[in-house]
Design a protein with these regions (language model features):
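S-adenosylmethionine/decaboxylated-SAM
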Residues: 66-71, 77-237
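A glycine-rich, hydrophobic loop/mini-helix early in the fold
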Residues: 44-63, 67-71, 83
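Short charge-dense sequence patches
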Residues: 23-35, 49-58, 96, 104, ...
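Membrane-proximal basic amphipathic "stem/tether" segments
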Residues: 1-52, 57
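Residues that form generic nucleotide/phosphate-binding pockets
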Residues: 6, 10, 43, 62, ...
């Protein structure tokens, strides 16, 4: 924990007991630089409804006894699965493979002719503290991982043909106050074949507040139906 974080915790201790807490800030809505599109509102409502009846029991079984996959609302896995069922994307791009639970949650509900391409700077096989993915998850060719950093302009260009075909993008990366902004800058230079939906994780974390607030595209905070640390939808036009 950084010195700044330690001091903040000491000066402003949490008013409640919780397993995990983060500091954030609230902002007025009337001067928000971007408003949600009707497409986002419809997608959010339909996806939340589908998420409420979605089962991820088979994937959750991989995580036992540490099962938080079924925590909904509160975690975003069922919401991501709901979005896939409603949107029916042909190509999903994930930025930040991590332990693979988001990939698995989305892949379960993809059409047979659809696929997920997930990016991380670390191979899933080498991810610290293990991974929930197995070789079998990649066998049908509908899940592919590239160990590349899409915040790099040169690497982004290398994958631009593939990225331009995305229907759904899920960004769950460093949240360091810089990387997600670099993703946004790179995506703004790309001509998408469709208008993808972009899902940003952790938008209420301190380092993500300015990035989310400054994003000048149709957007919607759906944290109540997603991740407790923040989930945002963007209608990338």
């Amino acid at each position: 924990m950084s010195l700044r974080k330690k001091l903040t915790h000491k000066i402003m201790p949490s008013p409640v007991d919780a397993r995990h807490y983060e500091y954030s800030m609230l902002f007025s809505a009337d001067d928000e630089p971007a408003k949600p599109s009707q497409r986002l509102i419809d997608l959010a409502l339909e996806s939340a409804k589908v998420a409420s009846t979605t089962s991820l029991d088979d994937i959750a079984a991989r995580t036992l006894p540490e099962n938080y996959l079924d925590v909904w609302p509160g975690e975003h896995y069922k919401l991501l699965a709901g979005i896939v069922q409603v949107l029916k994307p042909k190509l999903v791009i994930e930025i930040g493979t991590a332990k693979g639970l988001s990939s698995l949650s989305m892949k379960k509900f993809l059409a047979q002719d659809a696929m997920i391409v997930t990016y991380d700077i670390i191979s899933w096989k080498d991810y610290p503290n293990g991974n929930y993915l197995t070789e079998a998850d990649f066998k049908d060719g509908r899940l592919i991982q590239y160990t590349d950093d899409l915040s790099s302009v040169d690497i982004f260009r290398k994958h631009s043909d593939l990225l331009s075909k995305a229907d759904l993008i899920f960004a769950d990366a460093a949240k360091d106050g810089m990387q997600e902004q670099l993703f946004i800058n790179n995506f703004k230079q790309l001509k998408f074949a469709n208008s993808p939906i972009v899902v940003f994780d952790d938008i209420r974390l301190w380092n993500m507040l300015k990035i989310w607030r400054d994003l000048d595209l149709p957007k919607l905070d759906i944290t109540s139906f997603g991740h407790w640390s923040g989930t945002g939808l963007v209608d990338w036009k």
